[in-house]
Amino acid sequence: MADTEVKQEIAHVEGGDGRDSDQEASYEFTPAEEKRIKRRIDRRLVTTCGVMYCISLIDRTNLSSAAIAGMNEDLALVGDRYSILVLLFFITYTLLQPPATIMLRRVGPRPFLAGICFSWGVVMLGHGFVNVWWAMAPLRVLLGAFEAGFFPSCLYLISTWFSRYELHRRYSFFYLIGVLASGFSGVLAYGLMQMDGLSNYRGWRWIFIIEGIITMIIACAGYFTIVDFPDRSVEKSWRFLSERECQWVIRKIAADRGDADIDKFDFRKWAASGLDPKVWGFALIFCFVTTTSYAVAYFLPIILRGMGFSVAASQLLVAPPYVMACIMMMIVSWFGDKYKTKAPILITCSTLTIVGLVLMGFTTSIGSRYFGVFMVAAAANTNLPTIMAYQANNIRGQWKRAFCSATLVGFGGIGGIAGSLVFRTQDSPLYRPGIYATITCNSLVIIIVALLSVHFRRCNKKADQGLMIIEGLEGFRYTI
């Protein structure tokens, strides 16, 4: 599509004439047909990525379930050894994020995503056979290395198939599958613990063995269901969509943000995306949000145990807060896409997270502390797909999108490192230092979002007056 045509269509989309990108791209399909196309993309792309991501979340966070199922005693995880094992995962997970989205383009989504998923399944299986704590250290490093490419690659791939105001719901559904499965991972772990003694293996070993096998099976299935980029789908004439339907998707993306066509990879152009300050603002927000979400994911069974619940109750009570998170996530994503807003959601959820943290750390009633867990799990996890969509709504260009997906999730890895350290065993049962740290993180989210909102509003005003062109495309406006 010519650049002038793209500019004209973007101007229609953002210029206030009442039309959106779907309408601009609707040359040959009825609204009902367009919905059917989107549903097929949702089923094949979003659902597949979501199922694979859910097993990723379970595999990286099942350490806490194994810890209270006997692993700490068998491997002598005294002092800071447990936190070290949690931390080691995030070192490679963070460092290997940047090249992931480049590899995705070069290798292709099907072999790349299915291949790394199968690989970390093998590593997870190996967790069940270690006999000394330090032998698990290299396995955690390998697990982080293989999982590093998955999340940013999924964000990037999904963003190439949907227009800006379709992404929040898709990211939420993608992440919701993972969160829901993660919430019920305690139930799964409790069930696997009942295999204690089978073949002379302790219950915690069966958690790793069975979940590793499940991961490898899902990876094999995913190889046959993952879809390629829309421009490659046209070239390969996949049965997933016809060439005519793929062309409609490409035109829709071009009408929305003018970056449907992929440029030849240029390292300088890719790296130059890092000169945009807002890219690092998005990354910092994601870092601070993930600090809270990972801290809860890794330590919630242990925290509940410290509240006085039994081992079984601590495993089972993990699930309800995550069910609440899923409900809140879908409601908020619908609101965010319909009203084309993200910043107020981020600020509201961060505020709710702070309130929940205060209840967890500064009240004595078990009921109020558990209610605080509900608030923290729901609000913090709702903010994750919101910041993904916030970033995706405010950038343009395929390689910039690839760079930003990697930096976003890379900083999420840094948040994971922080989250693995904030709740320390010696701070039980109130974990005050961890509470202070996560309250600070959410306060910083509010500040950064407020600063970005002021900047975006000023830029939009200048663009309306014809004084600047945002993101190199006339008619483009920032989402606030």
What would you call each of these model-derived segments?
Residues 95-108, 327-341:
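Helix-to-loop junctions at the C-terminal end of transmembrane segments
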Residues 2-63, 73:
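Cytosolic juxtamembrane N-terminal segment immediately preceding the first transmembrane helix
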Residues 61, 90-98, 148, 182-183, ...:
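Residue-level signature of mid-helix packing/kink "hotspots" within the transmembrane helices
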Residues 64-65, 265-334, 384, 388, ...:
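Extracytoplasmic gate region of multi-pass secondary transporters
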Residues 64-96:
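Extracellular/periplasmic helix-loop-helix junction of adjacent transmembrane segments
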Residues 339-387:
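C-terminal transmembrane helical hairpin of 12-TM major facilitator-type secondary transporters
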Residues 94-134:
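Conserved MFS/SLC helix-loop-helix module at the cytosolic interface between two early adjacent transmembrane helices
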Residues 164-178, 197-270, 433, 438-439, ...:
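Central mid-sequence intracellular linker of multi-pass
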